[in-house]
């Protein structure tokens, strides 16, 4: 699968603008950013818990 070219990115951008409207785009982008930060922090916590759990298992 090849990376998206400029034409594909332009089409996606136009579809997003049509779906959400230009007034809501900043809010949508902000929400996506927050969601990504939360998701990343949860993944880090899961990995941390998994490492701690495996350390406990190895000690026993």
UniProtKB/Swiss-Prot annotation:
Localization per record: Cell membrane
Positions of transmembrane segments: 1-21
One term of GO molecular function: protein transmembrane transporter activity
One GO term of the biological process aspect: protein transport by the Tat complex
Xref: Pfam families: TatA_B_E
Membrane-topology descriptor: Single-pass membrane protein
InterPro entries, per database record: TatA/B/E, TatA/E
CC terms in the record's Gene Ontology section: TAT protein transport complex
Keywords: Cell membrane, Membrane, Protein transport, Translocation, Transmembrane, Transmembrane helix, Transport
Chief place where the protein resides: membrane
Signal sequence coordinates: none
Gene3D superfamilies: 1.20.5.3310
Record family assignment: Belongs to the TatA/E family.
Subunit: The Tat system comprises two distinct complexes: a TatABC complex, containing multiple copies of TatA, TatB and TatC subunits, and a separate TatA complex, containing only TatA subunits. Substrates initially bind to the TatABC complex, which probably triggers association of the separate TatA complex to form the active translocon.
Function according to Swiss-Prot or TrEMBL: Part of the twin-arginine translocation (Tat) system that transports large folded proteins containing a characteristic twin-arginine motif in their signal peptide across membranes. TatA could form the protein-conducting channel of the Tat system.
PANTHER family, alphabetized: SEC-INDEPENDENT PROTEIN TRANSLOCASE PROTEIN TATA
Protein name per Swiss-Prot or TrEMBL: Sec-independent protein translocase protein TatA
Organism: Corynebacterium glutamicum (strain R)
Gene it is expressed from: tatA
């Amino acid at each position: 699968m090849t990376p998206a070219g400029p034409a594909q990115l332009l089409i996606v951008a136009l579809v997003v603008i049509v779906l959400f409207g230009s007034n809501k785009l900043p809010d949508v982008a902000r929400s996506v950013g927050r969601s990504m930060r939360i998701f990343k922090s949860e993944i880090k916590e899961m990995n941390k818990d998994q490492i701690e759990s495996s350390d406990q298992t190895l000690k026993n």
